[in-house]
Swiss-Prot record:
It comes from the Eukaryota. SUPFAM superfamilies: beta-sandwich domain of Sec23/24 (SSF81995), C-terminal, gelsolin-like domain of Sec23/24 (SSF82754), Helical domain of Sec23/24 (SSF81811), vWA-like (SSF53300), Zn-finger domain of Sec23/24 (SSF82919). It comes from Candida albicans (strain SC5314 / ATCC MYA-2876) (Yeast). Keywords: Cytoplasm, Cytoplasmic vesicle, Endoplasmic reticulum, ER-Golgi transport, Golgi apparatus, Membrane, Metal-binding, Protein transport, Transport, Zinc. GO terms for cellular component: COPII vesicle coat; endoplasmic reticulum exit site; endoplasmic reticulum membrane; Golgi membrane. Zn(2+) binds at residues 56, 61, 79, 82. InterPro entries: ADF-H/Gelsolin-like_dom_sf (IPR029006), Gelsolin-like_dom (IPR007123), Gelsolin-like_dom_sf (IPR036180), Sec23 (IPR037364), Sec23/24_helical_dom (IPR006900), Sec23/24_helical_dom_sf (IPR036175), Sec23/24_trunk_dom (IPR006896), Sec23_24_beta_S (IPR012990). It is a peripheral membrane protein. GO terms for biological process: COPII-coated vesicle cargo loading; intracellular protein transport; positive regulation of ER to Golgi vesicle-mediated transport; positive regulation of protein exit from endoplasmic reticulum; regulation of COPII vesicle coating; reticulophagy. Pfam families: Gelsolin, Sec23_BS, Sec23_helical, Sec23_trunk, zf-Sec23_Sec24. PANTHER family: PROTEIN TRANSPORT PROTEIN SEC23 (PTHR11141:SF0). One of its GO terms (molecular function) is zinc ion binding. This is Protein transport protein SEC23. The lineage of its organism: Eukaryota, Fungi, Dikarya, Ascomycota, Saccharomycotina. Belongs to the SEC23/SEC24 family. SEC23 subfamily.
Amino acid sequence: MDFEEAEDINGIRFAWNAFPSTKVEAGKVVVPTGALYTPLKQREDLPIAAYDPIYCSNQSCKSILNPYCAVDPNGFWRCPLCQYRNPLPAHYHGLNPENLPLELQSTSSTIEYITARPVQNPPIFTFVIDLCQDEDNLQALIEDIIVSFNYLPPNALIGLITFGTMIQVHDLGSDKINKSYIFRGDKEYTDKQISEMLNRPISTQLMQQQQQQPGQMNPQLANSLTRFFLPLEDVEFQLTSILENLSKDPWAVANGARPLRSTGSALNIAVNLLGLTYPGFGARVMLFAAGPCTLNPGMIVGNQLKEPIRSHSDIDKDNAKHFKKATKLYENIAAKAVKNCHTVDIFAGCYDQIGMLEMKNLCNLTGGTLLLTDAFTTSIFKRSFLRLFNKDDEGYLLMGFNGNLEVRTSKELKISGLIGNASSLQVKSANVSENELGLGGSSSYRLCSTSPRHTYAVFFDVVNNQQLPPNAQSYIQFITHYQHSSGTYRVRVTTVSNFLTSDEQTLTNSFDQEAAAVLMARITLFKAEQDDGADVLRWVDRMLIRLCQKFADYRKDQQESFRLGPQFQLYPQFIYYLRRSQFLQVFNNSPDETAFYRHVLLVEDTNNSLIMIQPTLTSFTLDGEPEAVLLDSVSIKDDRILLLDTFFHILIFHGKTISQWRKANYQDLPEYSNFKELLEFPKKEAAELLHDRYPLPRFIDTEEGGSQARFLYSKLNPSVTYNTNDFIGGGGAGGGAIVLTDDVSLQVFMSHLQKLVVSGSS
């Protein structure tokens, strides 16, 4: 079975599909023993059991019955992780290979249990809308929010908060008039203050009236915080009316000033109010922001336009005066959301930065969406926002709420940590390693929200010190508890087994260079959040050199003898493109753009992450089939159309000759129908790529000499530049385009790598 087939079945990709057998050997392989796991990966033939799982009785294990368990005729099963002998339930007695229960069948390495415990509340959605924006942008946003009601379950609880200079919490339980409560935008309210201001006691007299007048609104709704979150089917008309009557914030904006925007206080109120009302139940706070917060708490920039918003350089030099204070506020709000299992989504609809860098942990720790768009009027926002509410074949939302991921291992392994959109629950079980990588010190992680897209990097420590027999196996079990949008609690269980080997050839053959590159990219991003950028790049280079010294074939000090086997051949170029990517080279990006790009890489699976690291390039010509070509400047030819997929952008580039023919409208002439077809091919291919991608990529149609061709040139390996010999000698015209850059080419990078490897340097 190849790596992608295994991923299709279990949603998991390992860097090493066989593990080093001892701690010493594991320390020499450079790339950590890790896995990329997608708990809710969609699978048509997923085994589903409509009963509760059977757990191992060993309190320090608590793994779940799975196909790797040995079952004896006396009604016992042996746990492969801890070797504990457990009694089977009475109705499982007398098992044989022909009548195995679902969870013991070989096809059930991944299985989902629908437990008997019902969810007490439906999912909750709170819309937090910025009113400091122009009318067109605001109206487009309101239209999309109203459309989204068609995608939500009718019993979903809905809340609404709007903000500008002041904050309005809308009371949806008031059926006669539209009622809202006003809060100051420049004050940080505690949950106690919010409760005292909004939560009125239920009077005995009112309760008696309720009993005498059946059919009237429940006093619980009229007099408690639950009146701010009501079923969509009950309040849709009123909510739509409120939204349609929203208008731009009336607070005057002086010349040379930014609007007074209270994003920080509005988010604080939304998260606290949900925490007071529905702690421990699936909920999303959806922020729609059209500019930076200009009021404390949470100020990103002052309201005077003469004060520029912070840049990467300002942050690096500690010149961003609001940065640390704002970051601390949003981290505190994120901690409250995590405690209550609530998710925060942030949608930006403006050219301005809104403060995503400061707010990123609101999404990164809660599994929320971070989406950067130029305006709420764009199709990128509209289609991406509505895709968040995609449904499965049964009509249920493809999102899991209020989840947690538990990782169980056999005795040879311990958990080093996790990197992804989750938060640690600090469960220090016996299988937790002292060597932390990412969010360490725990075997259990909170997933406030998860989906079929959410992928988590989990790292392991090989702790075995003894020589093992041939074909010794280790076992890992991932247990994901979550609240399904159908109103049930579910448990998704994936159990996998890996050989432990001391044979270097077996280890080499088990190496998945694609998964390894993505895992190393995640570690690199984790380091980039804490360390200096130059130090991170040096670390990346050292790791690559050490890996090649361990697994390449070469003779000392003979560069031409350097060879990498097929399992490692692509890995150096993945690292080359990672070094050049927007994830690490932040010079041309704002802090908000960097936060957005990094957030998406921490969510996606192996294939999508690889596209972000090393984009794909496809060539279309008149006399051949579409083919993948090198991501290199030599691939640009006059008679070619190129399709570039960077995940965030889909770009169609027309070569010089193709562009001239297109401008001459040859495609409109009957005798050039083949040229018309050529122009359509890449558009069809692009449409397929756009179909399921989240967030929706920006589509660019450009040509040789076009201003937006820079998006293509910036991604290409500059094998021909303005200062190479080819260019100086007049070459390059037939051998690709000239790239005006001082960046090192892949060929030079590989030459330096080989030189350092064979010299024994690190």
